Amino acid sequence: MYFHSTAIILFLNKIDLFEIKITHTNITVAFPDYEGPRERDCALEYIRVQFISLNNNKNRKIYQHVTSATDTARIQVVIDMLFDIIISASLKMVGV
């Protein structure tokens, strides 16, 4: 099981569209168990918790980012974080 301890990066992209759609479409269309309000932050937290609850390895790191690909500053932060993860994992593999 090679991927058992591999870090996961959860990208919740197109947040700008999500903010618009959540006011018009109930999130229960995709998540029937959701009982919270039609608010961005509440819905995002629910989605994050649902995703994280599927993780069977509590030592696995899960990085979560809410993004809009058109927001170049935010995307740069995410890219920088990805480089940090890759470098850290590479150093760990060689024992540094």
Swiss-Prot record:
Native organism taxonomy: Eukaryota, Metazoa, Ecdysozoa, Nematoda, Chromadorea
SUPFAM superfamilies, per the entry: P-loop containing nucleoside triphosphate hydrolases
Positions that bind GTP: N13, K14, I15, D16, A69
Name of the molecule in the record: Guanine nucleotide-binding protein alpha-9 subunit
Function: Guanine nucleotide-binding proteins (G proteins) are involved as modulators or transducers in various transmembrane signaling systems. Plays a role in innate immunity and maintaining survival in response to metabolites of E.coli. This might be by regulating the expression and signaling of genes such as lys-8, ins-7 and daf-28. Has a role in lifespan to promote longevity.
Residue numbers spanned by region G2 motif: 67-72
Assigned keywords, A-Z: GTP-binding, Nucleotide-binding, Transducer
GO biological process: G protein-coupled receptor signaling pathway
Family according to the record: Belongs to the G-alpha family.
Tissue specificity note: Expressed in ASJ neurons.
Keyword rRNA-binding: no
Transmembrane segments: none
Any one Gene Ontology molecular-function term assigned to this protein's record: G-protein beta/gamma-subunit complex binding
